Amino acid sequence: MKKYLLEAAQLARGFMPHEEGMSLYEIALQVAPRSAILEVGSYCGKSTIYLGAAARETGSTVFTIDHHRGSEEMQRGWAHHDSELVDRDSGLMDSLPELRRNLEKTSLNDVVVPIIGDSLVVARHWAGDISMLFIDGGHGPVPAHSDYESWASKVTRGGFM
């Protein structure tokens, strides 16, 4: 992984330990050439940078889906709430500007396509196969299972979930 991307990933807001990010990167390098990578839940883009680095090296694309309003534990009054990510006009959590800044800083805009919305809605309309699925959206059992049920059948044979 290029040094500037590694440094950007380590500095990006997020909760993924570096070792897990490197595992994502290594797996993506192996499966990405087959078809696209899909990430459910990008937050500010920490894991997206690891995946995007692999996509850059393999000529693949990362599609990352997030509504950018935060999962339950990121809301006001919860342990992982970050008041710096609250939109001043709406008063709602909004991690999209931070994701965009991270994609600009890393020049990964040409290999990462953010999709703003609910993953279940996007899944109903998704027509292509994916070689790698990384589910890190809603962390409760119901949202995580719903994401799995909606996306698992779209992973190609020999792909990774």
Feature names for model-found ranges:
Residues 2-161:
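S-adenosylmethionine/decaboxylated-SAM
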